[in-house]
Amino acid sequence: MGAHHTATEQSARLFADACAVIPGGVNSPVRAFNAVGGTPRFITSANGYWLTDADDNRYVDLVCSWGPMILGHAHPAVVEAVQRVAADGLSFGAPTPSETELASEIISRVAPVERLRMVNSGTEATMSAIRLARGFTGRPKIVKFSGCYHGHSDALLADAGSGVATLGLPSSPGVTGAATADTIVLPYNDVDAVDEIFEQVGDQIAAVITEASPGNMGAVPPEPGFNAALRRITEEHGALLILDEVMTGFRVSRSGWYGLDPVDGDLFTFGKVMSGGLPAAAFGGRAEVMERLAPLGPVYQAGTLSGNPVAMAAGLATLRTADDAVYAALDKNADRLAGLLTDALTDAGVTHRVQRGGNMLSVFFTAEPVGDFATARASETWRFPPFFHALLDAGVYPPPSAFEAWFVSAALDDEAFDRIAAALPGAARAAAEASRPA
């Protein structure tokens, strides 16, 4: 392996093999590099902040499996917990003590959550929370915000962020008008728009769902008081407030975004960090609402693998290992990365903004503050692919989309930042020299 990480023969071969059996060669669209071009790197191992690909290239990881790996990869406490539990069986289809332990740990951190139900993915968590909100209120309509991504269930794909934004789709083929007929999409950070829609049809609205601090149109935090305004408006009209913390939960603080902006949602959704990188998620909230779920109430929700003991073990080990020092390191590392990005892009004369949602961050190639999906899409996203590839070729792995957040781990050290600092000037020049598409 030379100074540059441009050898991709094995990744290219593996990608061709994958394309023969998997649509697009990937199991989640952003991994295909369609937004940036080039060959997706096939990762064979990870440890700490290092990723190693099939061509033996090593990268400083600034994706962290899209958020979960706050401790770094293969942390000994998490690996030991998973190995110990796996030796006793992988799945039972019956209650286990670890489900209660992890639920109790989460409830102890987020005060409005009195009851919690385990599921298998963030999509399942938000889908179930929406069903529960409708069942609890007896109302059909849901309010969401343009650019906020809540998984790929049909009703919530309307004007979503994440991969839908990356592909430039307004929604997705296959999502019928009937599926989104009761989904109202409003501009993010616009309290007046929320007030207006509630004045018009408030008695039909079951819930407002929002990312507690969005990271799926890039890092676009709520304006001060925005989430509190949603709380006020929903309470006035008898609707529920669902705060989606799948991305922010237990990453931006010990208590997630709630720890930074303590707004009492009626329901919360969690994922990513809470399962330490294994497939698990959860939704929870007020006991009065949660007790409408089967088997106590009439709102049905179920899952064969929900509460999987191996995922519960990974989640417990992650949360219990992530002490105050870990969260201090996450914030410090995000500060350091943001500073390096700002310095390099400024030195290269590139108009940009580095935006933060706690220790999540994004680079927008624009001079304007990015407060919603419209301003995110108006940025010079065509500068991002050469910026991305220059970093990748220098051994730094950022997210392969201009509309995704960057994530740090507590494992990053001076060696990691030395590599990032060495890579950024060339990447900034590549962004500066990029040509606007015809």
From Swiss-Prot:
Family: Belongs to the class-III pyridoxal-phosphate-dependent aminotransferase family. HemL subfamily.
InterPro entries the UniProt entry points to: 4pyrrol_synth_GluAld_NH2Trfase (IPR004639), Aminotrans_3 (IPR005814), Aminotrans_3_PPA_site (IPR049704), PyrdxlP-dep_Trfase (IPR015424), PyrdxlP-dep_Trfase_major (IPR015421), PyrdxlP-dep_Trfase_small (IPR015422)
Keywords for this protein: Cytoplasm, Isomerase, Porphyrin biosynthesis, Pyridoxal phosphate
Quaternary structure, from the entry: Homodimer.
Cofactor: pyridoxal 5'-phosphate
Catalytic activity: (S)-4-amino-5-oxopentanoate = 5-aminolevulinate
One Gene Ontology biological process: protoporphyrinogen IX biosynthetic process
UniProt-listed Pfam families: Aminotran_3 (PF00202)
UniProt name for this protein: Glutamate-1-semialdehyde 2,1-aminomutase
Chief location category: cytoplasm
Compartments, as annotated in UniProt: Cytoplasm
PANTHER family the record matches: GLUTAMATE-1-SEMIALDEHYDE 2,1-AMINOMUTASE (PTHR43713), GLUTAMATE-1-SEMIALDEHYDE 2,1-AMINOMUTASE 1, CHLOROPLASTIC-RELATED (PTHR43713:SF3)
Cellular component annotations (GO), alphabetically ordered: cytoplasm
Domain of life: Bacteria
